[in-house]
Amino acid sequence: MAKFQAKSQNDAPDDGLKEKMIAVNRVTKVVKGGRILGFAALTVVGDGDGRVGMGKGKSKEVPAAVQKAMEEARRNMTKVSLKNGTIHHNVFGHWGAANVMMAPAPKGTGIIAGGPMRAVFEVMGITDIVAKSHGSSNPYNMVRATMDALNNSTTASEIAAKRGKSVEEIFG
């Protein structure tokens, strides 16, 4: 039989991805004998060039929960098209009671966004953006709403391809 070595939790894969932990919550499961304490971690992972993923992990210990969240974030990565360090056009997204609005910004503006949205933008490589959140400030819902908005963005070439026209005809 082959022997398997246990991978230590400090061995992060060297794949060039940026990782950010957004939140760690203490959670409780109530059972007949009392309460079982655990932890839930929310993380985002990105390559700095438009790919970003989010993950949530739960465990009895914080490091294990963070590790599970990072692994899930790596599995759930999506590609978002960027234009000179910002997005192509205004986009809106929502998840639950969280609503987010994002607008492209000129070079040098920086990331004008709060809380969990800023972490998503930093790991995916956006350098200039203006973003506003309304409604729920729950970190999980805000990250999901941000991902929803980013997935709703399209490029001019994608719109032209859908319409069967050239990019020049679209901008007229």
From Swiss-Prot:
Keyword rRNA-binding (UniProt): yes
Keywords associated with the record: Ribonucleoprotein, Ribosomal protein, RNA-binding, rRNA-binding
Any Pfam family hit: Ribosomal_S5
All copies of domain S5 DRBM, residue ranges: 17-80
Keyword rRNA-binding: yes
Gene Ontology terms, MF aspect: rRNA binding; structural constituent of ribosome
InterPro entries from the UniProt entry: Ribosomal_Su5_D2-typ_SF (IPR020568), Ribosomal_uS5 (IPR000851), Ribosomal_uS5_bac-type (IPR005712), Ribosomal_uS5_C (IPR005324), Ribosomal_uS5_N (IPR013810), Ribosomal_uS5_N_CS (IPR018192), Ribsml_uS5_D2-typ_fold_subgr (IPR014721)
Gene3D superfamilies (alphabetical): 3.30.160.20, 3.30.230.10
GO CC aspect terms: small ribosomal subunit
Gene Ontology process terms (BP): translation
Function: With S4 and S12 plays an important role in translational accuracy.
Family: Belongs to the universal ribosomal protein uS5 family.
Subunit structure of this chain's protein: Part of the 30S ribosomal subunit. Contacts proteins S4 and S8.
Note on domains (UniProt): The N-terminal domain interacts with the head of the 30S subunit; the C-terminal domain interacts with the body and contacts protein S4. The interaction surface between S4 and S5 is involved in control of translational fidelity.
PANTHER family (UniProt xref): MITOCHONDRIAL RIBOSOMAL PROTEIN S5
Name of the protein this chain belongs to: Small ribosomal subunit protein uS5
Native organism: Polaromonas sp. (strain JS666 / ATCC BAA-500)
Classification lineage: Bacteria, Pseudomonadati, Pseudomonadota, Betaproteobacteria, Burkholderiales
